[in-house]
Amino acid sequence: MAERNDPCPCGSGKKYKKCCINKEISTPFDIWKQRAFQISTDVKHPEPLVDSFFAVFNHSIKKNWRGACHAISGILYVLLREQGIHAQLKVGFVKSPKVHFEFSHSWVEVDEKVYDLGLYRSNPPVASPNEYQELSAPIFHNIDLEANMETSIRYGVPSVREKTDRNLQTILNMTLGDYMNGWPNHKNGLWGEVIEIADRLGLSLNLHEIKEKYTNEQFSFNS
């Protein structure tokens, strides 16, 4: 627990007594969200960006999703676009200090800054239905929210496996609609998950309208 004169754990640079002492910050997730708001001071639409980011994060934790970067990125992309935020849906190879080889992954970018929730519960090196590997805390505006500094993850790195990576090639040859429709755990695919999260955000979205609007979108390859 921070003392009154300690630096505030939200990362604002202010003393705790001058910042979040009267706010309920009891978990790492709360601290991450406070840091995201601090990072967003010069960002357009900061509140819907932060709220949507963490609504998707909380939903993925509640549903116990692992290795779900494409699903998480697709949902976040649609929610941000529906709130007037010019997000881009990216896929490519990334490199983590915790993994000795580059691997295919997807994420969202806004104004060329990375917003990535998928590495928090990544698939482990040896597949297991009950385990995951934490490669990074959520990355918001290029910032690792746990370290509160620029992420060490490298995005869009080259790879000799570009043509042979089955996961990458599959996603590149699908529309967003194909992927969202094929999600097996909701009767309306991932579109239903979008509507669930939108309701929590106070957004009124129509299932059929968003399907029609985004069904032909695709993941953009970043290299």
List each language-model region with its residue ranges.
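A structural boundary/capping signal
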Residues: 16, 22-223
